[in-house]
């Protein structure tokens, strides 16, 4: 029993040491400072969530601008292998320049969450809070979008619950 305990302690010590080793030092995250992506731009992914898939973390969140809380861009996607260095993967769900669309530029699109559905092999935005353009918080809708193949890329939006994601 003592040999087993010693071996486990040695293994844990080695794992802690080697897991902390890296070719490149990680940049510290400083509270209260702007956190830059791989392009030196501040990460713009508010109210979002992080998912892990095939060795990579993906951060999805609302792109916010300085002048309004309305969605002027959409949902952003960032990827990271270490939770410190983030690559901008682009707009995952874009608002559109069509006032008859539920996701028209100027709508309120908040708190997007994405998961991987192993059964279908698709990445699914399991939901986001959606308010129609110019209606404030009166509509109280939820939105769903899905994508195939990779978590980074454009999500097709499915209004009125027509998504065949499951």
Residue ranges and their predicted role:
Residues 1-11:
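Bacterial N-terminal signal peptides that target proteins for export
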Residues 9-19:
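Bacterial N-terminal signal peptides
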């Amino acid at each position: 029993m003592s040999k087993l305990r010693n071996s486990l302690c040695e293994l844990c010590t080695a794992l802690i040491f080697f897991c902390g080793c890296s070719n490149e030092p990680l940049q510290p995250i400083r509270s209260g400072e702007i956190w830059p992506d791989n392009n030196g731009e501040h990460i713009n992914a508010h109210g979002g969530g992080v998912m892990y898939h095939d060795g990579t973390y993906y951060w999805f969140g609302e792109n916010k601008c300085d002048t309004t809380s309305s969605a002027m861009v959409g949902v952003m996607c960032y990827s990271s292998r270490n939770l410190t260095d983030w690559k901008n993967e682009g707009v995952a769900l874009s608002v559109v320049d069509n006032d008859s669309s539920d996701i028209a530029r100027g709508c309120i699109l908040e708190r997007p969450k994405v998961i991987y559905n192993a059964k279908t092999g698709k990445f699914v935005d399991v939901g986001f809070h959606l308010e129609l353009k110019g209606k404030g918080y009166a509509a109280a809708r939820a939105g769903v979008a899905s994508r195939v193949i990779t978590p980074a890329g454009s999500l097709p939006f499915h209004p009125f619950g027509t998504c065949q994601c499951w």
